[in-house]
Amino acid sequence: MSVPTITLNDGNRIPQFGLGVFLMPPQETQEHVAFALANGYRHIDTAAIYGNEREVGAAIAESGLPRDEIFVTTKLWNNRQTDAPAALAESLEKLGLDHVDLYLIHWPTPRFDTYVQAWHGLERLQTEGLTRSIGVSNFHQQHLRRLLDESDVVPAVNQIEVHPSLAQFELVDFNTGLGIATEAWSPLGRRADLSNEVIIAIADRIGRTPAQVILRWHIQRDIIVFPKASSPERLRENADIFDFELSADDMRAIDGVDAGTRVGSNPETFNRR
């Protein structure tokens, strides 16, 4: 499987496609990640709060692949924003790794106002070589502006909810203007967008599945995606998106599905710790 890479603003390269393990039970995670790695996946996205870092690490070890061929992302949970070094140390122990490729602040949790402190912690972790790149997740424009008012280090990545029903045009453009790569979590809208009539019509016409059409829409927007997959068949289907392109008309039609509809929490109000 040949997956394009994107060069981040720190010079590191990230595969534009991978596997996400959000809400994947630990007992299933190792098997799914191992299968994905054996079938060409080279980018795994996990997080401390997912509770499956240890299984991700076991699958990586089991794969026998060179460490530098696998891009591993994990995330700093909200209650550890003032203690990022210890939090990453715990994640690395579970993963069985001496560094991750990308470490993200999972949410800004604005009520607690500690994300700038967390960012300075991530800067130090990058300097120490414990993470190759650093970034944020679920940050809106005002969170990014505040961060850059108080730091000279621009996040390499902003991972946000993006799917056809929540296309996030303004935020993606804002990220791009700052040199920040956009990653999409829930790129299929937790599968709700798969039943959209516009997407189904395009899929039927070009002989692809709705999931493949949506994932290809992300790829052509230069967005990084890592859809969750619940079966080997779905893993293969999701990855089979690099031998076709959507026309400009099809891209515009999918853009038109946008309704500002979230399937996840709003970063303005999400403060769970």
Where are these regions (language model features)?
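Acidic (Asp/Glu)-rich catalytic clusters
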Residues: L8-N9, L37, G57-R67, A89-D98, ...
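Glycine/small-residue-rich loop that forms an oxyanion/phosphate-binding "nest" at active or ligand-binding sites
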Residues: K75-E123
